[in-house]
Amino acid sequence: MLAGCSFSSSRHQMSTAQRFDILPCGFSKRGSRGDGAAPRVAGDARSGATTCSFRTHPAPPVTQSVSWGAKPEPGGNGNGAHRAVKRAHDEDAVEEYGPIVRAKRTRMGGDGDEVWFHQSIAGTMQATAAGEGEEAEEEKVFLVPSAAAFPHGMAAAGPSLAAAKKEEYSKSPSDSSSSSGTDGGSSAMMPPPQPPEFDARNGVPAPGQAEREALELVRALTACADSLSAGNHEAANYYLARLGEMASPAGPTPMHRVAAYFTEALALRVVRMWPHMFDIGPPRELTDDAFGGGDDDAMALRILNAITPIPRFLHFTLNERLLREFEGHERVHVIDFDIKQGLQWPGLLQSLAARAVPPAHVRITGVGESRQELQETGARLARVAAALGLAFEFHAVVDRLEDVRLWMLHVKRGECVAVNCVLAMHRLLRDDAALTDFLGLARSTGATILLLGEHEGGGLNSGRWEARFARALRYYAAAFDAVDAAGLPEASPARAKAEEMFAREIRNAVAFEGPERFERHESFAGWRRRMEDGGGFKNAGIGEREAMQGRMIARMFGPDKYTVQAHGGGGSGGGEALTLRWLDQPLYTVTAWTPAGDGAGGSTVSASTTASHSQQS
């Protein structure tokens, strides 16, 4: 996490330069400062006595040093948690390559598993109250302004925020916690926070306090987003400070933890919205997710594979569809455009080897940006294939998804080719031309089928930022609840590692815009429109076998929480798509597509495709 840091206007030498502090321990207690000023509500016609919560430098701005290293634990070197996670999951690595087994789990002690939301920004967000739990003392680390320390009583020069909110409530009895933020009106403020309740015996939050804080966190997040939409940096600063006091990646409920990462993303967005006021140099992992994931993403994916059905649902369901496509073919070729650690393919190799007549040759082409990771994945898959007695070949392509060309893929005559895209194609939605080119590349391989596994975004790709923020909060709150349901201990480094993978998605989806925002999740209906209207593909359907596989995996991890929904099909059979849901929230959808108008059926690669490869080679 972030260590102590401050940043100032080093490029813009202005007398109005502001400072944004990031401290490793949250914020000072409300009673410790008496000079905090309540933020001015956007459009407020009251007196200008209210001071700006972004403090002005008393002296000319000076470039300040920044330290982003994580604060080590007392008496340790800070690497213990990483080693503990690695040991725990290296022992279980063989499970990822074997048959599906029932995961051993325990349930959390609390009884508050469901998440309920109330109406909020643009009528799309709902507040949540998560389960009970006692919050231990922990160090809170957030990208939030430490200068925004407000006294508990919220006393300040001029009209206080509490008084303003009281007047607002007296005018409108409805419990509205946000506004559209686009009409120039005031940004909605949440009710004055109440003093936290503590158990006198051990100093931890009293029973029920965690649920109340979870509800307040949702209100603060939506109000902060509303303030950003209204251009009110003073109110946004206040809410970021308030969120920093309550939210924590080690919090007692999933809402505390997901709110911590949304707070960080909102703070990054503040910096990007007012670059003339603030200057920050965060580490590359905060701004470049492709660089910052690395080994952390690899380990997080393995952990997620062990504690949730998400990777297994995507991989095994698509593998069942792929096996049906490869039936009767002697030479098969899978092109995986984001292979990562190759967790999907040992199961496929086992199924192919178990056939009465296994294929004579199996080729997997893996695309990725890390040469070392691709080499390790290829060696691991080669060992699995050798143990199964399969003739196997792995081909690595080191390049970005949008830069791959046909000649790099080594497609050969006589192969039955399948294209696999799991959690990869959504990164192309930032550029329609790039997506069109990629679909053209997929068709040019002569593939008989394109397998697609993606987030069921439901509007996270387009629309107003406020609405996208609300949908993202609902989506990732459900994802954190799903991780929490695995029953890992509250201080588990494995759980933290899995949640940090979602945090990188949150950071990009909330803080960035334009070409820099590549976490653009689309719904199944949106993907169908893109694939069929100009993409050159038609839906190939998901069969009953695939549907049974997906439902079996969901039942393994939580029959009362996870469900699998078929689109365009009835009964227990398949349809056009399958969606994995957590309670009422869709999470991930798998689909299969075949080139439209392929009269020959696409069973073999055309002579022109082979000739193109030969010329380039």
From Swiss-Prot:
GO molecular function: DNA-binding transcription factor activity; sequence-specific DNA binding
Alphabetized PANTHER family for the sequence: OSJNBA0084A10.13 PROTEIN-RELATED
Distribution of this protein across tissues and organs: Expressed in the shoot apical meristem (SAM) and elongating cells of young seedlings. Expressed in leaf joints, culms, internodes, stems, young panicles, primary roots and lateral roots.
Family classification: Belongs to the GRAS family.
PTM: Phosphorylated on serine and threonine residues by GSK2. Dephosphorylated during response to brassinosteroid.
GO biological process: brassinosteroid mediated signaling pathway; positive regulation of brassinosteroid mediated signaling pathway; regulation of DNA-templated transcription; regulation of mitotic cell cycle
Description of the deletion phenotype: Semi-dwarf phenotype with small and wide leaves. Erect leaf and panicle phenotype. Reduced lamina joint bending angles. Reduced tiller number and seed set. Reduced brassinosteroid sensitivity and altered expression of brassinosteroid-responsive genes. Decreased cell size, increased cell number, and abnormal cell arrangement and microtubule orientation.
Keyword check for Secreted: no
Protein name in the entry: Protein DWARF AND LOW-TILLERING
Sequence motif VHIID, residues: 332-336
Complex and partners: Interacts with GSK2. Interacts with SMOS1 (via C-terminus).
